[in-house]
Amino acid sequence: MDIRLLVLRTGDTKRLADFYSLFGLTFDYHKHGNSPFHYSATIGQTVLEIYPLTKSQTEPDKNLRLGFGIDNFDETVQKLKEFGVSFSLEPTQTDFGFMTIISDPDDRKIELYKK
């Protein structure tokens, strides 16, 4: 089994796509079928899509926690600091590897691991 699709919903799709672009992702802005315009990037075989909130949602899900292995870890951490991203765990060695924990613009916790 593998993960093929991950959808994040947000009140500001461009802001969230710009944030995740700091990790080296390249997003396309498009729509298909009756879906709203949204951003889409590919990570290996997984598609990460950023959609607007549904009509019944008033805010994004802040309980979702994501983890990414980062090729240019030190450079990415520097870019995130320059961007003013909040770090809840500064880069450090853990039992799970060298990592840091940040929050995305919707306050989801994101674990970044040095590859």
Each predicted region: which residue ranges?
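Short beta-strand-to-loop junctions in surface cap/lid or active-site-entrance loops
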Residues: G11, L53-T54, K115
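Broad, structure-driven detector of short, well-ordered beta-strand segments within folded domains
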Residues: L48-I50, L112
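Absolute protein N-terminus
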Residues: M1-D2, K115
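Vicinal oxygen chelate
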Residues: D2-G11, H30, Y39-T42, Q57-K115
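Structural preference for long, well-ordered alpha-helical segments within the folded cores
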Residues: D18-L22, K79, D106
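Core segments of cupin and vicinal oxygen chelate
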Residues: V7-V47
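Residues that act as N-cap/strand-start positions at coil-to-secondary-structure junctions
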Residues: G33-S35, K62, T94-F96
